[in-house]
């Protein structure tokens, strides 16, 4: 049960046991009666501030269709994060924040990471989200946001040009945009927990700089896993198509991965006998542009990320040294003090 919990992005034990009882995702029935274990990373990662005063109010139509009503907000990371470059030399460019979109009908999440919090980049996120929705014949009709960057003229003008209505929550009243706020809380909690788990086992390699990968991985697991009480995933509800990805396709975030050398992948012989037949990379999620069994692997030497199929996962992290308390404590302190500090609201709603 604990191993599945790690693989499914620290999904609640109760959800995993419910899937086991329902015979979903090839989870053995014995899992449904396991004693609930303790996950140390969850104990650290789920620590939050006190909830805001007052109730969380839902806005929008009672029974919307996908695209009818979407909420959007900005996630401030607090720590620069890796940009997934696929070629070239290591770069000092980093992501600093993300724009998060939540469709209220399906609870499907769209995340765009950004280098700057500018109107131009935020508008580009909106355009990309609209293209994604249009691919499945969904049209964004109403957008709900807070003020700030979403009140800029270019964003407002683009909404008007596309015949979209646009409403705002009150200044400082984040809970009036409660749907996206609580899902940002969900993503940051899961991402923080995955990072802490990975750093605990591999502190010399995993750092808070991996947060963009962790956020994207958390969103992808959410989108392709049924919510509590649902038989379809948020992705299936939004796209109205059978999901080609299941929780079984995911692996433990940040675990070591052995990638077959390119020559051997191409069916060629190794040019030099002294060269290794594989290299060790870091699992940072599944590729959104390939088959469900193609993983995204971060190469620590080149700092590049690539989709890989011929891989072996070390999900129990048995092939690397995991004992460096000083580095681990430093990273835990950095995550606790700086990462995702602007999004710690607790809502009583069930957002899983």
Task: Show the residue positions of the predicted features.
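Retroelement integrase C-terminal DNA-binding domain
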Residues: 1-2, 6, 11-44, 49, ...
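Mobile genetic element proteins and their domesticated derivatives, centered on retroelements
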Residues: 4, 16-19, 39-42, 73, ...
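RNase H-like two-metal-ion nuclease catalytic core shared by retroviral integrases
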Residues: 145-161, 166-192, 206-219
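Beta-strand elements of modular eukaryotic interaction domains
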Residues: 28-30, 58-62, 83-92, 100, ...
């Amino acid at each position: 049960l604990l191993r599945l919990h790690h693989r499914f992005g620290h999904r609640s034990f109760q959800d995993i046991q419910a899937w086991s009882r329902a015979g979903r995702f090839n989870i053995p029935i014995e899992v449904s009666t396991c004693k609930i274990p303790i996950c140390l990373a969850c104990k650290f990662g789920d620590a939050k501030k006190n909830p805001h005063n007052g109730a969380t109010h839902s806005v929008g139509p009672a029974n919307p269709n996908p695209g009818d009503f979407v909420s959007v907000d900005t996630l401030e990371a607090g720590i620069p994060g890796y940009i997934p470059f696929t070629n070239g030399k290591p770069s000092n460019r980093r992501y600093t924040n993300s724009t998060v979109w939540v469709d209220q009908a399906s609870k499907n999440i769209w995340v765009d990471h950004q280098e700057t919090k500018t109107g131009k980049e935020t508008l580009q996120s909106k355009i990309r989200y609209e293209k994604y929705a249009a691919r499945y014949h969904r049209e964004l009709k109403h957008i709900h946001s807070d003020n700030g960057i979403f009140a800029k003229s270019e964003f407002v003008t683009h909404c008007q040009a596309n015949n979209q209505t646009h409403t705002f929550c009150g200044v400082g009243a984040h809970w009036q945009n409660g749907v996206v706020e609580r899902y940002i809380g969900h993503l940051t909690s899961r991402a923080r927990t995955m990072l802490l788990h990975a750093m605990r086992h591999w502190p010399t390699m995993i750092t808070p700089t991996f947060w963009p990968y962790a956020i994207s991985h958390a969103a992808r697991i959410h989108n392709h896993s049924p919510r509590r009480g649902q038989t379809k995933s948020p992705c299936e509800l939004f796209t109205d198509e059978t999901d080609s990805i299941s929780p079984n396709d995911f692996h433990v975030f940040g675990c070591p991965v052995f990638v077959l050398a390119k020559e051997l992948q191409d069916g060629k012989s190794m040019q030099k006998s002294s060269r290794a037949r594989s290299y060790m990379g870091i699992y940072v999620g599944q590729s959104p542009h390939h088959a469900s069994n193609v993983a995204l692997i971060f190469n620590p030497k080149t700092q590049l990320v690539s989709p890989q199929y011929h891989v072996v996962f070390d999900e129990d992290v048995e092939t690397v040294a995991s004992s460096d308390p000083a580095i681990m404590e430093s990273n835990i302190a950095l995550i606790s003090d700086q990462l995702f500090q602007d999004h710690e609201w607790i809502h009583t709603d069930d957002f899983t």
